[in-house]
Swiss-Prot record:
BP GO annotations: plant-type cell wall organization
Chief subcellular location: secreted
GO cellular component terms listed in the entry, alphabetical order: extracellular region
Segment forming the signal sequence: 1-26
Family affiliation: Belongs to the plant proline-rich protein superfamily.
Tissues and organs where the protein is expressed, per its UniProt entry: Mostly expressed in aerial organs, particularly in expanding leaves, stems, flowers, and siliques.
Subcellular location: Secreted, Cell wall
Gene source species: Arabidopsis thaliana (Mouse-ear cress)
Region (24 X 5 AA approximate repeats), start-end ranges: 168-319
Start and stop residues of the Sequence repeats: 168-172, 173-176, 177-181, 185-189, 190-194, 198-202, 207-211, 212-217, 218-223, 225-229, 234-238, 240-244, 245-251, 252-256, 262-266, 267-271, 272-276, 277-281, 282-286, 288-292, 293-297, 298-302, 303-307, 315-319
UniProt key word Secreted: yes
Protein name: Proline-rich protein 2
Keywords associated with the record: Cell wall, Repeat, Secreted, Signal
């Protein structure tokens, strides 16, 4: 009997080799985006140096794909160097073989704190266009340079470090060490004798030994098998479904440039001249008070005779309470 080999092994090998070749081809492709950043209004802020104005700024590439339903997706980001230039890499999937972009991509400038900077020349000035191609490497760039104002797009904060002079030398006393004294001669003493404790006296009579207490072993136990009580079957466990949270979709903030309004001059209002009108009040009616009737006369009491006073004269009372 003859066993024929299967023909499926060769197809699997060819598929594996094709996958390796596609991965190597995709890794060899390199897509770079280069550009420069320009400062506007530098003469107004003379305290900021040009290398410090670019420190901390970042450039992000936002692309508008067809399957993203009109939303922008971040494809790459990079920092701006001291000369105002930047270069970063983006995925090669969004670039065709002829160098054309499959998606509409734009460059956005961000401050050192991650806030987006306003675009001065509009959105079309920051659009990514094809520049050159050498082999599998594509070089993309911008239509115009990105412009920003240091007043709106804030860079890193640098402290001004003045050159302080060195402190004066310290006037310290000379370093001296204490004198080492010679050791005294040893003093020999006789050893301390500790007296031994006396032993207890010996017992003269002989001890009387009694027979030991007998030890009875317990009887051999008889083991019986335990009564098996059948358990009721438990109900089947109900596994709760595990709901995974949805994948968050981060939307980049829409940059709305602020509208400039003309200055408003507030009108100056003056208080009008007050017009005082006289207020006429009715006269107060005074009701005369009726006279009170005359009080009756106080009856006359004869003076009380006291043979002798019990107390002396009282001191005079004050007139005020």
């Amino acid at each position: 009997m003859r066993i024929l080999p299967k023909s499926g092994g060769g197809a699997l090998c060819l598929l594996f080799v094709f996958a390796l070749c596609s991965v190597a081809h995709s890794l060899s492709c390199d897509v770079k985006v280069v550009g420069d950043v320009e400062v506007i209004g530098y003469s107004e802020i003379s305290k900021i140096k040009i290398p410090n104005a670019f420190s901390g700024l970042r450039v992000t590439i936002e692309c508008k794909a067809a399957d993203s339903k009109g939303h922008f997706v971040t494809r790459g980001s990079g920092e701006v160097d001291e000369t105002g230039k930047f270069h970063l890499n983006i995925p090669h999937d969004i670039v065709g073989d002829d160098g054309t972009l499959k998606e509409a991509c734009y460059a956005h400038l961000q401050s050192a704190f991650g806030n987006p900077c306003p675009a001065h020349d509009g959105l079309e000035a920051s659009k990514i266009v094809f520049l050159s191609k050498s082999g599998q490497n594509h070089v993309l760039g911008l239509k115009k340079s990105l412009k920003f104002s240091p007043e709106v797009c804030i860079s890193k904060f640098f402290w001004h470090m003045p050159k302080f002079p060195l402190p004066p030398p310290l006037n310290l006393p000379p370093l001296t060490f204490p004198k080492i004294k010679k050791p005294c001669p040893p003093i020999y003493k006789p050893p301390v004798v500790i007296p031994k404790k006396p032993c207890p006296p010996k017992i003269a009579h002989k001890p009387i030994y009694k027979p030991p207490v007998p030890i009875y072993k317990p009887p051999v136990p008889i083991y019986k098998p335990p009564v098996v009580i059948p358990k009721k079957p438990c109900p089947p466990k109900i596994h709760k479904p595990i709901y995974k949270p949805p994948v968050p979709i981060y939307k980049p903030p829409v940059v709305i440039p602020k509208k400039t309004f003309p200055p408003l001059h507030k009108p100056i209002y003056k208080h009008p001249v007050p017009i005082y009108k006289p207020i006429f009040k009715p006269p107060v009616v005074v009701i005369p008070k009726k006279p009170c009737p005359p009080l009756p006369k106080f009856p006359h009491f004869p003076p009380k005779y006291i043979p002798h006073p019990k107390f002396g004269k009282w001191p005079p009372f004050p007139s005020h309470p």
